[in-house]
């Protein structure tokens, strides 16, 4: 998260929300740390969650989508894409979801 955009309290709140989100997705330990550590990642994860909630009303379905293979990502699930490509992978997932919402 770029500190110039947000104050310390906002950064802390976003990080906590992203950590809770990742836990709801069933991601733990090193994988959760990998998703959360780095500038811009909490905001990207929250953007992904927002987009998924626009598409799916059921939070269990959201968690299943994150871990399901997706042809749009070459058969890789969104979670693996985000773990492998970091922030760039998160941005790709978010862009895909936003395009799905817009279509």
Locate the predicted segments by residue.
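Non-transmembrane "mature" sequence context
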Residues: 1-103
């Amino acid at each position: 998260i770029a500190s110039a955009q947000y104050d310390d309290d906002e950064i802390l709140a976003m990080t906590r929300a992203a950590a809770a989100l990742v836990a709801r997705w069933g991601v733990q330990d090193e994988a959760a740390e990998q998703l959360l550590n780095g500038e811009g990642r909490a905001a990207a994860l929250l953007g992904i969650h927002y987009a998924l909630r626009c598409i799916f009303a059921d939070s269990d379905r959201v968690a299943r989508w994150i871990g399901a293979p997706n042809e749009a990502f070459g058969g890789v699930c969104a979670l693996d894409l985000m773990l492998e490509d970091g922030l760039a992978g998160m941005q790709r997932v978010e862009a895909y979801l936003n395009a799905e919402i817009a279509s």
